[in-house]
Structure formats: C-alpha cells, structure tokens
C-alpha cells in the first residue's frame, strides 16, 4: 500500500474557527478524517501531521525522506510564502510533492500570490475548500499508479 504524508502548517489547527469565508467550517480533525477516508477508497495509507513550529515541520519532512513515503501533500499555510527552510527540506525528497490550499491564494492579498514551495511541487491545487485535499489525493494516486515520481 502506497503511503501518503499530508502536512498542515502554521495556524491550520484553527480550521473551523478561522475566517470561514476563506476556509469553511470544517475543523482540522474533520478534514483529517475525510482525507483518511478518501485515501482508504484509493487504497492509500494516509499519515496526517500538523504543527505550528517550523523546525518541527522540517524535521517531519526529513523523517518522511528517511521513511520513504511515496508522496507528500502539503498545506504550509503562511509558510508557503516565505519558508525557505521548509522549501529546502522538501527539495531533499525523492517522492512527488503536491501543494494544496483551501482558498485560492492567487485571488487573495498580494503577499499570498507567491509560493516558495510551488517550484518544488509536481503541482498546486487551491481554491476548492476541503475538496482541494481530495483532488490532491487523486493526483497523488494517479502519479503513483502511473509509476511516475
């Protein structure tokens, strides 16, 4: 069974409480449960992780490299726009990386338009709410089933 690591970054533990116009009302726990269910339907093993500490995120990405995860889906939150440490950690991975966001970062404030992760990712999915995670899982499954990295 292919293993997918789903990473959620800074402030994303506040889903369901923070700015429902952009992020909806689902909590991170509800999102993680949906991701696990969607993964099971696709025959994928899902591991979800969230932290508000950049160093912890980098260390989890390093462990993903050591564990040999098959793909990584990341919603880095605000780190998307400035964390070169997270970007450098992602660059170490051999597995495909898919960047995901619940809101359309390109239709929001100017500072959100730039991603330091996008250039390292196979693709970026944004603007579909919780469905962005589902689309990312479908993309990961397609990549892995096609034998692409």
UniProtKB/Swiss-Prot annotation:
Keywords: Amino-acid biosynthesis, Aromatic amino acid biosynthesis, Lyase. Its EC number is 4.2.1.10. InterPro entries: DHquinase_II, DHquinase_II_sf. It holds the Pfam family DHquinase_II. Substrate binds at residues 75, 81, 88, 102-103, 112. Transmembrane segments: none annotated. The record marks 18 as: Transition state stabilizer. It catalyses: 3-dehydroquinate = 3-dehydroshikimate + H2O. The active site is at 23 (proton acceptor), 101 (proton donor). It is an enzyme of class 4 (lyase). The keyword Lyase applies. GO terms for molecular function: 3-dehydroquinate dehydratase activity. Belongs to the type-II 3-dehydroquinase family. Homododecamer. Catalyzes a trans-dehydration via an enolate intermediate. This is 3-dehydroquinate dehydratase.
């Amino acid at each position: 069974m292919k293993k997918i690591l789903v990473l959620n970054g800074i402030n994303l533990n506040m889903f369901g409480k923070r700015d429902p116009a952009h992020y909806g009302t689902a909590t991170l726990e509800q999102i993680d449960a949906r991701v696990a269910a969607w993964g099971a339907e696709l025959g994928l093993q899902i591991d979800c992780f969230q932290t508000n500490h950049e160093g912890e995120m980098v260390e989890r990405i390093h462990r993903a490299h050591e564990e040999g995860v098959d793909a990584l889906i990341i919603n880095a939150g605000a780190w998307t726009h400035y964390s070169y440490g997270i970007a450098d950690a992602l660059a170490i991975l051999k597995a495909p990386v898919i960047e995901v966001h619940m809101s359309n970062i390109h239709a929001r404030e100017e500072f959100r338009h730039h991603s330091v992760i996008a250039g390292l990712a196979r693709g970026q999915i944004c603007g579909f709410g919780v469905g962005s995670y589902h689309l990312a899982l479908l993309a990961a499954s397609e990549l892995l089933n096609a034998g692409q990295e």
